[in-house]
Amino acid sequence: MAIVAVGTEIVQCARIAQMIQQHGEQFLERVFTAAEIDHCAQRPDATGHFSRRWAAKQAVFKALRCHRRGVSWTDIEIATHPSEGPTIELHGIAADLAEEAEIDAIHLSLGGCRTQAIAYVVLCD
């Protein structure tokens, strides 16, 4: 297994909080899947959870080099499995691009504090 690409993103949590406050459900439904919204909304620090997922999606966009290639935000889903922690599931065009690039594994690391969220993604063949 070799590293094909990496992507990283850092975001101010206040920026995501502002987007949620200004655009509400429209923003959430454009960027996050129903499962992601449900997961984050149930957490005491919902803004932090949404921010980390937003950062992860941006990191995937960078690693796949798929900006302006028709990939929607919801084509990249940050799923949470109790035994594994957060993982990336690709759908639609994002999944097609990963298959075309022969990506067999996607590794994700999320972090953050009260004010910032960060994600690091490694794509492997």
Swiss-Prot record:
EC numbers, comma separated: 2.7.8.7
GO MF terms held by the record: holo-[acyl-carrier-protein] synthase activity; magnesium ion binding
GO biological process, one term: fatty acid biosynthetic process
Entry binding sites for Mg(2+): 9, 58
InterPro entries registered for this protein in UniProt: 4-PPantetheinyl_Trfase_dom (IPR008278), 4-PPantetheinyl_Trfase_dom_sf (IPR037143), ACPS (IPR002582), Ppantetheine-prot_Trfase_dom (IPR004568)
Keywords in alphabetical order: Cytoplasm, Fatty acid biosynthesis, Fatty acid metabolism, Lipid biosynthesis, Lipid metabolism, Magnesium, Metal-binding, Transferase
Cofactor field: Mg(2+)
Domain of life where this protein originates: Bacteria
Pfam families, alphabetized: ACPS
Transmembrane annotation, as ranges: none
Family per record: Belongs to the P-Pant transferase superfamily. AcpS family.
Function noted in UniProt: Transfers the 4'-phosphopantetheine moiety from coenzyme A to a Ser of acyl-carrier-protein.
Protein name in the entry: Holo-[acyl-carrier-protein] synthase
Classification lineage: Bacteria, Pseudomonadati, Planctomycetota, Planctomycetia, Pirellulales
Gene: acpS
